[in-house]
């Protein structure tokens, strides 16, 4: 039988839109006996997901900001190479909150899995997981770490180039004034010019944009504008 990583490599080469890609990922997960798949792209504190996990679990995960608690994400950030995990097997080493997290995930058939993290552009990272409802993942053969990273690199590139719509992402918002000022920034206006056009004081524009930068945890207006455009907030 062809290994699931080989199938992912084949899928990455297929022409088509994001629907074909998402359907293909779900089919591969199902064919090889996994509960589902999850692709996470982590840009500093901004996280997007492409996954077929249960919708309720996706909502809960992002609403409660579980990425900060998730032992799999923590491990992926530090290891940067393929690993298996099991909520039950790791239980003795987990905190009370981490055990509760795994217990909650198990309600949706996520008890163990295989995760492949990779470095991506600008110092960010992506990770791809195949999850299982079994207590422990039983690998039929050893997986080459370099080959695994290469495969997920191709999946990451495919998702990026297709500008695939996330199935879930962390909450982000701009109030009306912030959105208005950022739209002006996006077309090249300075804060002084924005204040003049909008009939407000320069300091009002500066404070509003500073508040938004703090909320998005970015250090420049250019970065804030790029995030707002990417997330279709302006």
Curated annotation (Swiss-Prot):
Q: What PROSITE patterns does the record point to? A: HTH_LUXR_2
The Gene Ontology CC terms held by the record are: protein-DNA complex
Task: Tell me the CDD domains matching this sequence.
Answer: LuxR_C_like (cd06170)
**Which species does the entry assign this protein to?**
Rhizobium radiobacter
| Protein's UniProt name | Transcriptional activator protein TraR
Q: Which gene encodes it?
A: traR
Keyword set includes Repressor: no
Location of the HTH luxR-type domain? 167-232
Example GO biological process term? quorum sensing
Q: Which residues bind DNA?
A: 191-210
On the tree of life, the source organism's domain of life is: Bacteria
Q: Which Pfam families match?
A: Autoind_bind, GerE
Membrane-spanning regions, if any? none
**Calcium in keyword set:** no
User: What the protein does?
Assistant: Positive regulation of conjugal transfer of Ti plasmids. TraR activates target genes in the presence of AAI and also activates traR and traI themselves.
The molecular function terms of the Gene Ontology recorded here are: DNA-binding transcription activator activity; transcription cis-regulatory region binding
* InterPro entries, A to Z: Sig_transdc_resp-reg_C-effctor (IPR016032), TF_LuxR_autoind-bd_dom (IPR005143), TF_LuxR_autoind-bd_dom_sf (IPR036693), Tscrpt_reg_LuxR_C (IPR000792), WH-like_DNA-bd_sf (IPR036388)
Similarity comment: family membership: Belongs to the autoinducer-regulated transcriptional regulatory protein family.
* Protein keywords: Activator, Conjugation, DNA-binding, Plasmid, Quorum sensing, Transcription, Transcription regulation
């Amino acid at each position: 039988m062809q290994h699931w990583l080989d199938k992912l490599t084949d899928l990455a080469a297929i022409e088509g839109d994001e629907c074909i890609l998402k359907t293909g990922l779900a089919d591969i997960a199902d064919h090889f006996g996994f509960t589902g798949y999850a692709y996470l792209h982590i840009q500093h504190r901004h996280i997007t997901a492409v996954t077929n996990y249960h919708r309720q679990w996706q909502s809960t995960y992002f609403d409660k900001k579980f990425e900060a608690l998730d032992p799999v994400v923590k491990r992926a950030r530090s290891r940067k190479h393929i690993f298996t995990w099991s909520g039950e097997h790791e239980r003795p080493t987990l905190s009370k909150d981490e055990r509760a997290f795994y217990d909650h995930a198990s309600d949706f058939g996520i008890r163990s899995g295989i995760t492949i993290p990779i470095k991506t552009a600008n110092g960010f990272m992506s990770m791809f997981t195949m999850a299982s409802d079994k207590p422990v993942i039983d690998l039929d053969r050893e997986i080459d770490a370099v080959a695994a990273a290469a495969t997920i690199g191709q999946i990451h590139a495919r998702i990026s180039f297709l500008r695939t719509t996330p199935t879930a992402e962390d909450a982000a918002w701009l109030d009306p004034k912030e959105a208005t000022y950022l739209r002006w920034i996006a077309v090249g206006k300075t804060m002084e010019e924005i204040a003049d056009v909008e009939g407000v004081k320069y300091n009002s524009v500066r404070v509003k944009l500073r508040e938004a930068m703090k909320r998005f945890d970015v250090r420049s207006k250019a970065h804030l504008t790029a995030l707002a455009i990417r997330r279709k907030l302006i």
